[in-house]
From Swiss-Prot:
SMART domains, sorted: VWA
Coiled-coil regions listed in the entry: 333-357
Protein localization: Secreted
Domain VWFA: 511-708, 959-1131
Keywords: Coiled coil, Glycoprotein, Repeat, Secreted, Signal
Signal peptide: 1-24
Compositional bias of kind Basic and acidic residues: 765-776
Protein name (record): von Willebrand factor A domain-containing protein 3A
SUPFAM superfamilies xrefs: vWA-like
Amino acid sequence: MKKYRKISIGCFAMATQTSHVFHGQENMFLENHCIRRNTGRDSKKPLKQKNMNGLGQNSDNGLLVTHVNQTQDLLRLQGSETQSSDWEDSEDWLSAHSLKCQKLTLADLISQGTEVLEEGTNVVQKICFSTQIIRHFESKLSDTIEVYQERIQWLTENSKKAFGLIKGARVSILIDVSAISSGPQKEEFQKDLMSLIDEQLSHKEKLFVLSFGTNAGSLWPDPMEVSASTLQELKLWVKTLQPDGGSNLLQALKKIFTLKGLDSLVAIMRSCPDQPSEILSDYIQQSTMGRDLIIHFITYRCDDQMPPAVLKNLAEAVRGYYHCYSPKMEHYTSRDMDELLAEIQKAQSLLSHVQALQHSSPCEALTCTMEEISTEITNGPLISLLPKPPKHDAPLTIEFPNLDKTSAEWLKVNGLKAKKLSLYQVLAPNAFSPVEEFVPILQKTVSSTIHEKAMIQFEWHDGTVKNIHVDPPFLYKYQQQLSRAMRMYERRIEWLSLASRRIWGTVCEKRVVVLLDISATNSMYIIHIQHSLRLLLEEQLSNKDCFNLIAFGSTIESWRPEMVPVSHNNLQSAWRWALNLRCRGSRNVLSALRKAVEVDFKDKDKHQSQGIYLFTGGIPDQDMPTLSAYMAEACGGCDLQLNVCLFYVGEPKMDTTPPARYASHTDTAAAYKEVTRAAGGRFHWFGDTGIYESDDINSIMSEMEKALNYSQKCAFLMASLKNHSGKVLGSSALPKEKPKTLQLRSQPKKLCPPRPTVPLGARMSIKDDPDREKSPPLKSLKWRPLSSRVGISPAAAQPTKEGMMELRRKTKSREAETSLLLFYTEKGNDVGSVYKKYPQGRGLRRTSSSIDLPRKDTVCSSQEWVAKYGLKKLKLEISRCMGPNCTHQKSGQRSASAKHCSIFPSVEIHGVVRHIQWTPREMEVYIRHLEKVLRRYVQRLQWLLSGSRRLFGTVLESKVCILLDTSGSMGPYLQQVKTELVLLIWEQLRKCCDSFNLLSFAESFQSWQDTLVETTDAACHEAMQWVTHLQAQGSTSILQALLKAFSFHDLEGLYLLTDGKPDTSCSLVLNEVQKLREKRDVKVHTISLNCSDRAAVEFLRKLASFTGGRYHCPVGEDTLSKIHSLLTKGFINEKDPTLPPFEGDDLRILAQEITKARSFLWQAQSFRSQLQKKNDAEPKVTLS
């Protein structure tokens, strides 16, 4: 235990101090690893170091060593294996070694204990742990902390200390030379850069380096493949770096973003950039939109010139990585380091609880009898173990804010109409309505006309058409004003997205009551609720007149009986009260609203500017129409608004007590929006990823869209003016360019009969064809060989009538755009042609300009979805870019290939040579389409792995029954199944099904209802209550459950969830189901929770196949986390790992299509590179 106590103290020191220095023998293995990497192929030093550290006494691994060279080879092999894992991406490494992945969380410890129930009830009174379990868990925690310490020590060695761990394979390096000075500092900087090149950059695929100061200069024009020569050239270039004025980072970024093929950007900064961080952040985000680019910001020796927090904030804004290094204080921080430290703090906190638990009783069976722990375990997670922000319990740091306004009020002063920037306001002086009057002399109505198109007709806001005099300089000035207004609106949106406004929006009223949701479903988020309230008290409430806080669950708890004036003491008192809040009960929103309206705002008619801010995370206990009616009546006739701040906390967890009401996050948001509309307030919805919806931001966005619309109409006016000018100029030149002879030759009857040189059939096929004007261009019907050596007779090559018809069918798609005039020349044998309508460009002749894919996921099987949006249906097979098999090499009549064998690149596929018939542009379009389709496939796969679909799959039918196995073997899975079943009821059955029923089976079956029940809210709540009482016991009688389910009237689909085979014969079950299927067309979809039992899996597959259903096997947590990591990183590059094999039908079919799309994408990228190489190799023709 002393060892564990020592490690715990060491972790605390590391987490609280700024200098991360570790000592001891536990890091020797990583030191050996780094020494091996730095010494390259020198195997003597690693061997010597290993013996010195005492790590050479490893047990024999079965390999007999007979020579010293073999020992060195084994050590080198071992070093390479450990090197690959150590140099793994930090996120991947941490996900594989996290406490959750190693099952070292508090929930994992509690699951190993034995529950002791209170007599006569199902309430957990105690949880018992054996000494062996406690010691084993403590030992694993200590070992994990040591691994984290070793990882941190490794991250602070060699080049990683100064520059961090460089991610990516194709890296661009930006080096700030503004602060380079001669002397020891310059030599040390060059030395560190040399270490970075040798240790990390030498293992990359491509490199591009650029130095910048006032100006930017690169070593190479394009990214270079990493080789010994390029690395040597890079080292020589580093030695020549000289200081260059300022630090123009923006100019360097502009040069980098023009390059293609890079996946990592590293900026090594030595001083503060010339541009503000807001401008750099916006530019980086816009330039990297749609690109998978890893961004690193590294601060090197910039203590005096720039605080490291500047670039750290910039890196966080663009979701990149940061690394700060200060050799004076030996201080280095990075995102990788911070994540490791956070994990160590969690491990150390948990270790202290485990140690306290072990010392609480000396007996063999330790019993947790402390009331606090047992109560918190019963109610939810331990609050003391939840992560807290820095200085969470400290007193408030109160600021005095400005007088904020809602966006609607702000736009009354800064909107386009208020600034007189409405397009119709601007154009009104130069807009004239068309005049139309009746002329008595002419006895008809005469309309005014515009002289020589001097004005442009333009649709006005009321639907009428006006004549506009277009003044280009005036419109240019107006466009500049619109641009300034757009920038102002962007700054407003950015301001609304920062600090407490990101959570609460703008609190503008002078009298405020805040309602806090502390229901049991928010137990995991109590720290978040408290921190959000802290930000509000510090930043937005100090300039108010009165305020109060009300917390509500099943009951309400108020900080003060009524509103009190805002003061420093009252704000601090309110914060201390909030720190003691605990989550419990349901979500009684109506009681909290009644307390605020009827007590705090009892004299609401006598005051102005009053607001209620409801901070909640889910649907209330009461019906939304009731809340809407109550608030509409309460807010009517007075200046009182209800503003809702909704935070998304995920789906509610299943507990012994289900929530009073359930709704998805989208339905919850829609319900609260109705309440805010009825109460004249504002709606604000946010989550951990940002703001989802905000009325304040929507108002600004609407004004920006209006400005954009005005700008587009200005561009339309300018384009119309240019078109009119072009028409006037071109009208006089057009008759001169159009010869009259072309119109005469278009008449077939005036053609002179030529000499009978060409076969009659070919000539008559042209003469008698009434649509020959739409024929493709033919220069002559004379046959010409493809090469100089030809053994085919000219007669065989003459076009026949069938050949001409086939040619027209192939060009039918271009007939609408192309119109030709054919005629015979004086030579008689030749046919000439003249375009009457020119053909469109053929750059995309085999690829469509757009791919139609659904934005939202439709409820259907993967087989149906792939049939609609698969690669074959979208015509995206790679074979479409390939020509037929090349037979020119096999010709016996000639030795040379045809001419186009040298023109079109060829590839060998399965031993057959085929030509690539697409141009580089067509191949580029095809690759873009494939990447778009692949992203959509990945989105569909993520949808299938989310929510209740992960366990149950997708429910397709409208009248279904869920069969749930509750036998004794289901005990380990039952709690998870109950949670997912509640989610299934609300997420799929409530939304997509007309009627449903639930049926559990073990030795016998138990149905929720006798028949299918209509899907309503009340029915779903009753089903939830029924699910909570399910218990696992007995055997597995599947046949009886199926017979009962088939008896339900109008049943369309059955969903059978089990973990094994039936107690009876599998063939008997299949035969009985086959007989039932003959009478009723009911599909049975099977779900297996135990994929290791292959016999059970085969039985469930056959059962689903016989009935036309689908087999589904849920993905495990470990596999799911790996898949999520793959899908979020892009999953497009060839080096990315493949998807794991899926058992379920829906996942397997979609994964096969994804694999096929990735294969096509890699082949297309290879073909594109061949086409580019061939184009680069062709000699360029210059015109003199």
